[in-house]
Amino acid sequence: MSMFNKVTKTFQWGDKTVVMETGEIARQATGAVLVNIDDTVVLATVVASKSAKPGQDFFPLTVDYIEKTYAAGKIPGSFFKREAKPSELETLTSRLIDRPIRPLFPEGFYNEVHVVIHTVSLNPEVDADIAAMIAVSAALSVSGIPFNGPIGAARVGYINGEYVLNPGQTARKNSQMDLVVAGTEAAVLMVESEAQQLSEDIMLGAVVFGHEQGRIAINAIHELVRDAGKPVWDWQPAAKDEPFIAKVTQLAEEKLRAAYQIRSKQARTQALREASASVLESLKAEGADFDAVKVEALLFDIEAKIVRSQILAGEPRIDGRDTRTVRPIEIRNSVLPRTHGSALFTRGETQALVVSTLGTERDAQRIDALAGEFEDRFMFHYNMPPFATGEVGRMGSTKRREIGHGRLAKRALVAVLPTKEEFPYTIRVVSEITESNGSSSMASVCGGCLSMMDAGVPMKAHVAGIAMGLIKEDNRFAVLTDILGDEDHLGDMDFKVAGTTAGITALQMDIKIQGITKEIMQVALAQAKEARLHILGKMQEAMGEAKTEVSSFAPKLYTMKINPEKIRDVIGKGGAVIRALTEETGTQINIDEDGTITIASTDSAKADEAKRRIEQITAEVEIGKIYEGPVVKILDFGALINLLPGKDGLLHISQIAHERVEKVTDYLTEGQVVKVKVLETDEKGRVKLSMRALLDRPMGDSGRPAPAERGERGDRGDRGDRPERGERRERREPAGADQQQQQQQSTGAGEHSGQMDA
């Protein structure tokens, strides 16, 4: 009899088989489920504290997604040969899992919950993120922890006009969309996507399709819970102290309503702080027994009620706008004088200083991902320091939120970037948020597009982004355009849409409540399009098209094509030739396997010099052409002349002069620069040269050209074997001269050979 009480559920999901197991691995966790989708295997565990910490006023949920390199049969490349800090992909996947499960824990549940997911086996054609979301949903469901799930999740592609469920890496290369949707059986909770300028209807159809497919996983999880679920915790939220709530409401409501009539964020924030302090002072004066943390939570609830009721009643929003108006926009380009491209994008009290930098192929980010190595030549980094919200805080490592916002902005812009052939630069965009009052990630999208255009990046179209919000009470709802920070906190949805005039390039949605219908999403998308087109109009006024030239401070890229067989000559033995080229010309040189060479330099003269030298190195010796080069070696039977870098030819003693030459050194010295004509080349690449062919024949006493000298007569042989009269017979070469010539010529070429990757 086995020591394990193992329960397994198998179901077919599209063209993939999914196996869920629990009861064998990680039995001491509150809940643990192993999910296998066509050899991609993830282990999700969840552990929850039995009680909340005293004074806890928020839900402490932590999600850690971890990829193990052994899952792909690899050993980590770091010095310590073990997994270290989370990669960007691991951080983004952790956020992807966190977002749909967080709203499903009941209000008032403040027990610490830690979700850990390990990817332990990877099929590159099956993404681990979807398997991880299914596994986490199942682990939470079987754990007995208070959780209003399960959730389902699915990836949706759009190929040849049809939606595709969970496309793999290969299929996604032909997909116009990469969308991940998660939700409960009844409602969508989270959407994350990028697209190739698709319409609102196509995007909404993908969300609906993905949600329907996610229900298949939800049904299987219900079956697993029936067979292996643990008893549900006997947890009840703390009873509400209605008299105390009424007291706080009486003290605070009027002051809070007055504060929310103030249109300026800073003044409003100050008024809210004063209202909070006043309530606490009044409670102290009355001798009430209270917890300050609970009072702050009550004040937040009162604020939410005030703001939400005003909006649903058709009253102006916090800053005085109606539900459809975008805040005032101001744009300034070329803000920073020495950067390659920059833009300052301000929308109300949200401001982004966005800077673009152009680099060479060497500057591209090389990522050793679990599914395989790849190169990324477009990077978008988002930073938001504490001063952006007028707060004191710590500056340190990049936060998860910053990584997530940067990736969203990147998703929005990547669809309109030029191809590598059209624009071979590596591009890095950095968005510095200098003010924030809602939708800073979408300000980063707008500023990023403008700064790249300012840098001379030939974008296919302008891209703008907008953040939408939602207030919903029963059957009444209001969709808000361009939400403020307070509206984000107090509302029910954060819905970000980016795109061009032609369609959507990125969509992100986080919903805090159940009951968001397809109709509400349609209204939100239509309203977002209206706002997006308005912002695009402002951007086009500020910068109609990209600059035609890159900045004088940016490297200029010059491309040339050589015979791939000549690559080793350009690199040289141990990289000696290319190293000398880059050092002596002050350029960066990149060589592709197909023979494409890219030269990068801020000085066109230096780039031209590098190009000239590469042309010399790779040039072929032409028969009949005259070259000028130094004597590199004197031989008994002639001399080696350098014609091109790495290419020497043999000047035979008989081809030095018209007269008889007894000693080569009487005519030539090493280092002497001479002009020679190429007589012939053979199949082995040996080159025969002549100086004599470029010299006039000396005149005899009669004024006629002197007859050519004859060699030793020896055996005269038959008449037919003799040369015609006046024709010169070449001197016989010493034995082995041909082999010496081959050896000497190959020596020079050999010095420039080397491995391409040296």
Swiss-Prot record:
HAMAP family given in the database record: PNPase
Residue sites binding Mg(2+) per the record: D488, D494
Example of a GO biological process term = mRNA catabolic process
Q: In which organism is this protein found?
A: Paracidovorax citrulli (strain AAC00-1)
Needed cofactors:
Mg(2+)
Task: Give a GO molecular function annotation for the protein.
Answer: RNA binding
Q: Which residues form a coiled coil?
A: none
Compartments, record wording = Cytoplasm
Q: What is this protein called?
A: Polyribonucleotide nucleotidyltransferase
Q: Which keywords describe this protein according to UniProt?
A: Cytoplasm, Magnesium, Metal-binding, Nucleotidyltransferase, RNA-binding, Transferase
Catalytically driven reaction(s): RNA(n+1) + phosphate = RNA(n) + a ribonucleoside 5'-diphosphate
Q: Which residues form the S1 motif domain?
A: 624-692
> According to the UniProt entry, what is the EC number of this protein?
2.7.7.8
Instruction: Give the family this protein belongs to, as stated in its UniProt record.
Output: Belongs to the polyribonucleotide nucleotidyltransferase family.
Its function, per the record, reads: Involved in mRNA degradation. Catalyzes the phosphorolysis of single-stranded polyribonucleotides processively in the 3'- to 5'-direction.
What are the start and end residues of every segment in region (Disordered)? 692-758
One GO cellular component this record assigns the protein to is: cytosol
Instruction: Indicate the segments forming the KH domain, all copies.
Output: 555-614
| Low complexity: bias regions | 736-745
Q: Spans of biased composition, class Basic and acidic residues?
A: 707-735
- Tell me where it mainly resides: cytoplasm
